[in-house]
Each structure stands twice: as C-alpha cells, then as structure tokens.
Amino acid sequence: MKSLIIAEKPSVGRDIANTLNINEKRNGYFENNKYIVTWALGHLVTNATPEQYDASYKEWKLNDLPIIPNKMKTIVISKTRKQFSTVQSLINNNKVKDIIIATDAGREGELVARLILDKAHNKKPTKRLWISSVTNKAIKEGFNKLQDGRKFNNLYHAALARSEADWIVGINATRALTTKYDAQLSLGRVQTPTIQLVQMRQNEINHFKPQTYYTMKLNAAGLTFHCTKPQSHPDKTVLESIKKAIDGQSGHIASISKTHKKAYPQQLYNLTDLQQDAYKRFHLGPKETLNTLQTLYERHKLVTYPRTDSNYLTDDMVDTLKDRLKAIMATSLKDMAKAQMSQTFSSKQRFVNNNKVSDHHAIIPTEVRPDINQLSQRESKIYMMIAQRYLENLMPPHEYEAIAIELKVGQHTFTFKDKVTTKLGFKAIYENKESINTQIDQLQKGTKLNVTKILIEEHETTAPPYFNEGSLLKAMESPQKFFDLSDKKHDKTLKDTGGIGTVATRADIIEKLFNMNAIEARDGKIKVTSKGKQILELAPQKLTSPLLTAEWEEKLLLIEQGKYNASQFISEMKAFTNQVVNEIKESEQNYKHDNLTTTECPTCGKFMIKVKTKNGQMLVCQDPQCKTKKNVQRKTNARCPNCHKKMTLFGRGKDAVYRCVCGHTETQAQMDKRHKNKKSDKVNKKDLKKYMNNDEGIENNPFQDALKGLKF
C-alpha cells in the first residue's frame, strides 16, 4: 500500500519526487514502492456558475436576483479536467492507503486540496505536509513531522466559507449593477473599498490648501542652530522681532548633551513590505514582484514561502540561521556574511517571536547557494533585497552618539543636533567609515560663539502624495489610517485582521482595478477614473467601506479557531446579499459613459468606449452583450534604436506603426526588417497577429468569462 501526495503545482510535485526518490515517471504523476506524488494546477475544482444551477441564469436579468443556492455546487475546471481525472483515479486507487496534502500551507492551499478530495468522494485518511520552503532539507523535515489532516478541518471550513461568500455577494452585486445600469460594472468586498481608498486620497489632495510658515536659523562656529521657541510660526513678523532682538549679539553654549544610542535595521520582509520596496527601488509592480518571488521560491528554491504577512521567525529556525548565511556568501555580500559566522545566535534575537508568526514566517533566503549568473536581472534584484535584509538583521546594531547643543543668544535658545557614529554595525553594508565631528569636540558649556548669519526661511505645507502601486498596497494593509471610523473597535478590527484583502490577493486586486478601468496610473500617480467614481456612487455604502472585509476576516479567523460556525457565517452573507440587491434595484441613479467616442462598433453600430489599460488604450463596445473590442495603442517590448526606450504600437496589421517618445517612428515592415537578425527580440507578424486575434481583450479582463453570452 502507498501514500498519495497531492502538491499544488507540478514544480512542487517534482521537488517532492526528487527529494523522496520517487523516480518512476507516469502520465501526471511519479511513483515508487512507497509513494505516489501528483499535483493540481492551482485550482482543479471551482464554484459552479449560476447557469450551471439553472440554464435560465445564462441570460442576466435583474428580476432573477438574488441568486442564492440552497447548497453550493462545485465543478471541475474544463481546461484542467485531464489532470483532475488523473488525480481522481489515484485517490480512488486500491493501492493507495492514505492521502498526504502537500498544497501551499495556508487557507487557500487547503481549499485547493479539499475541493479535489471532496469532488473525488475521498474516504481515505489524510495527513498534512506543512512547510515554508521547498528545499530538500525542508521537505525531508516536513515529512518527518506530518500532521493529522483532521487538525486542519477548521482551516478548510474557513476557506470554503470565504469562497462561497465571495461568490454569493460578488455574483449578485455585479449582476445587479450591470443589469440595472446596462454597463459592465463590478462590485466586491475588497475591490470596492480599494477604489474608495484611492478616491479619499484624491479628495484630500483636491481639497488641500497650502499654508505658509516660517522658521529661523543662525550660523555660529561653522554649525547651524535652529530656533526652538518657536520652531516655526505662520506670522513672519514674530520671527523678525526675534531676529531684530538678537542681531549683532554673540551667544554662549548653555548645554551640551551626548547620548549613546543604538539603531536597528528594518524588520525582515513580509510580502507587502517587499513589494513596496521593490516598487520604490526598481519600479516593479506588486504583481511583478510576487511573480518573481514565486519563481525564486518554486524554481530556484532560493527563498522561503512568499505569501506571508509576518516579519518574524520562530525559535525552531535559529539553528538554520548560519546555513542561510553560508548560502548568501555566494553573492557580493560574501565578506559581510562571513564576518557574522563567528556570532552566536539565540531565540532572543529581536526578529524571533513565535507569537507573531501564524501560517508562515518572514521571507528569508533558504540554505541553497544561488548562482546569480543563472538568475534573470529581476530575480537577482529581488533575491539580493531579501539576502541583504536578512544579513542586516544578523549583524550588530548601528551605534552612535546623539549630540544636542543649546546656544543662548540674548533671551532666545537655538539648538544644533547631530549624530556621530561610534560603531557602524549593520550599516557597514552601506558605509565604509565612521563619522567624526572635530568641531563639536572643541566646544564645551559656556563657550562664547560669534553669530555670523541669521536667516528666516519661508516654507509651505504640501499635499499628501498620490498613491502609487507600492504605497496603495501598504494603505490596503492599514486602511484604518485613512478611513474615518468613529468606533475605535473598528480601528482595532481592521488592524488585527490585516486590512483590505490579504498579502496573497492585494496585488491581484490592484491589477484587476486597472484592467476594469476603475483606476488608472498617470506618471506613477494612481487616480480613480470616471467609471470608478460612478461605481462608488452606485454601490451600496457598506460595500465601499473596509469594515465589511474586516468583519469577514474576523469571523473567518474565528472559524479557523473553531469558535464560530461556518454555516452561520454563510447565512449572514445571504441576508447581506439580499440587502445589497434590493438597494441596487430601488436606486434611482443613472450611469453615464463619459468616455464615449464617436467611433461606431463594427458589430452592432453603437458608439464605442475608450478604455485605458495598464499598457495602453482600446475601444470597447458600450453594449455589455456585444464583446467587440479594438486596440488603439499598446506599449510593447520593442526597443527604439535611438534611445532604447520601449515603443508604443498604434493600429493593426499592415497599418501598424511603432512610435517612441523621442519621436522615432517605424512601420511594421521596418520593424520586421530591423529585427530579422535578432530573432529573440523580434516583434514579428505571428506574435502581432496572435495578440490582435486574442479576442482583442483587455489583459486579464475580469469580465471576459462572466459576461460572455450576456443578454438583456
């Protein structure tokens, strides 16, 4: 008898097979005399569509809503049916005694496996592999510590409740809004509050009125001293009177203080922090960073599990710290890493805290030595960010003297502040020498100083910045800082539940909002589009607040802990859905396509709408039941021969033209000719045709499946 191992992806299945010497390759699985290892392809099973409950639901009608099944159904995803059949036959194979769930260690990973087992009518006992990296060592240790699958039943119940609730609320709210206003509109408990978050920041900027204020400083002994009372003032005459009173006077040092202090590095990375830093440093979008992390985790085995919200490690990992240091010695950090090998590490390290790790610890390097030359430029950048942050946290703290000197001039006090490094510590990664300020060493209390210059400076308060992809991600994590919530309990709920969405879903949500044209980015500034503003006006108010998702996450966490009933949660979601649908039905508002063009749809003759996508623009028919789309422009990977920037594609077919911001223009024929000897860089006719014929759709269009066959 054998154990069947179900991994979430083929790459992880192969890793497990290699580690456990499961070498006999079959069609969709590996096998030896002890194990069979197979895999999903992400989800193999999903929730049924409304029309799979009742064929009449294929036509979207407002009067049919709400659609609330008594019992939710699941279906096998058509494009992965073959692999499901393989997994199903293995589950029910007589030579299989038990199932080892080896999908991602978390709520969604549990759901992937349990839906498959449920659909295959599994009756066999289950065990759970729970690991945070897929190195040989981690897999072996995980198999030595397999847990009873029943221990994770509540995790599955929470995952299933989340999935069903999202279906019930999302399907009904989207269908209600779309049919009510005859437009492709979408609502969701995560995406709608995110639009609101961007709009609130936009309103704050629009309503901001700059305020002028003044500060005063003076120079003495080559140092700059700042006025302390007042530090700043809106009335310039107040500071002018002080200047007049002290003009021509010398000062004396009233006090000198030197305080020894320590500074510690930033915390180990969780996913959100890493995505935000990658955007700041390399202008990588959250989705790009996550995809790169997945490759580093799955293919290269260089980093631990990426979808984590923790900045800490557990104490059982302390013994592995030096092995990970050895791994990063294969990089440019070699000398710094080697210097830390003589240290003794313990569970008292500031980044070790079992209570602050739930499913997964912080993102850190694995024990696998990287070959940087085998990584892409993006992979190398992300890996080095993780390796450097890890090394910083293992190095001693930065030590310095905080110096404060008070200079008395007449009746007024001015202060000079500085920091003098005594030990570089972790900052040795960035700096190569310790700072010395000899001027300060020559000063003592009572020393008289001549004032050489007195300056009054004018300043102006600035509006908060627009969100970019990195800062929006961080705001979604802490929405209580932006929403005005009168009840402090709600603040705590949002903080405790991790804000809007999860670390695993936020990047997808932002991407989806771009693709559905609810938000747009101009010069890195994210703004709400006219469509997004109207969605906020038309949506039931509770769907625009982050409180709904916070309340959900709070109850889902209780379900995980066995303290709340999943069926009760679903009943509440059904009641809420009824309220949402009724509110939309009774609304007397209107939706206006203000991005309507005078271009007629070649299929139905109605005017088309200009839609901005993340990589360009396209025309989409305003009629939801007509799926006609036409590309206007699209940023490509083709590089300008003059300035080497990416060129934008206009038109299609023989009329296609590539233009660069520097003014260079090429036809498709010229582009083909220029690249005929550079096949790897070529934007050829075949690729162009494939792009043009791919339904001319918006990238990752969230409505493509939901709206096909839509009739009113």
Swiss-Prot record:
The gene is topB. This is DNA topoisomerase 3. The active site is at residue 305. GO terms for cellular component: cytoplasmic replication fork. Releases the supercoiling and torsional tension of DNA, which is introduced during the DNA replication and transcription, by transiently cleaving and rejoining one strand of the DNA duplex. Introduces a single-strand break via transesterification at a target site in duplex DNA. The scissile phosphodiester is attacked by the catalytic tyrosine of the enzyme, resulting in the formation of a DNA-(5'-phosphotyrosyl)-enzyme intermediate and the expulsion of a 3'-OH DNA strand. The free DNA strand then undergoes passage around the unbroken strand, thus removing DNA supercoils. Signal peptide: none annotated. NCBIfam families: PRK07726.1, topB. Its EC number is 5.6.2.1. The keyword Cytoplasm does not apply. It catalyses: ATP-independent breakage of single-stranded DNA, followed by passage and rejoining. Its cofactor is Mg(2+). Residues 2-135 form the Toprim domain. It comes from the Bacteria. SUPFAM superfamilies: Prokaryotic type I DNA topoisomerase.
